[in-house]
From Swiss-Prot:
Source species, domain of life: Bacteria
Protein name (record): ATP-dependent dethiobiotin synthetase BioD
GO terms for MF: ATP binding; dethiobiotin synthase activity; magnesium ion binding
Cofactor(s) listed: Mg(2+)
Organism: Corynebacterium kroppenstedtii (strain DSM 44385 / JCM 11950 / CIP 105744 / CCUG 35717)
Amino acid sequence: MSIVIMTGTGTDVGKTVATGAVACVLQKEGYEPFIVKPAQTGEPEGEGDAPRVTALTGIDNAETLYRFPEPLAPATSARRANMPYPELTTVAEEIKSFDKPGRVVLVEGAGGLLVRIGQDWTIADLARELGAPIIVVCSTGLGSLNEAELTVEAATRRGLTVLGLIGGSIPDSPDLATRCNKEDLPVVTGTDVLGYIPEGAGGWSQQRFVQEAPGFFVPDVVGRVTRESD
């Protein structure tokens, strides 16, 4: 299987834009990226993270499996709406159905690694069920080291393979904390940084984003992603 879980250290750290950037790099190298959002909350049909990736990249291989009305953790939103919880095995099988030779399935989680998607399971559980490695998207400012280290530690304790970190938003003129964090993130987490997304990249034109996305990452990012996800 070629499935990679895109998770984060929390909400609004840049997972969607990072997912789009990884998809662009994969496509440039001849792979067919396919984006899956297991659960979207607080967005009507036709909107949300998967459509945002399509708008940003032009890649229309994107599916949202479940939607819940309020912008909360998926399990909480499902409970409050009296809607059935997504089942782990069902979601895993749906994701596997998108996998095929030459394709890399990017699964964008909701919030952080341990956010409840179903009643009793998280994105970490989904990664383990799929046997899929994860990429952790993190913030880069003050407080980011603790969040990144906690997320990587939680993943490794569960036996998950962490491919690396992506800084979800890096300013043109980073402050002192951000500059220090760029040096310290790989040290405290024991995990490579695969790249940094420029601040505001989610508002770029599709043409600019697709052209510049490969420059966000280390040169061998595609090899790392495809080698570990096979």
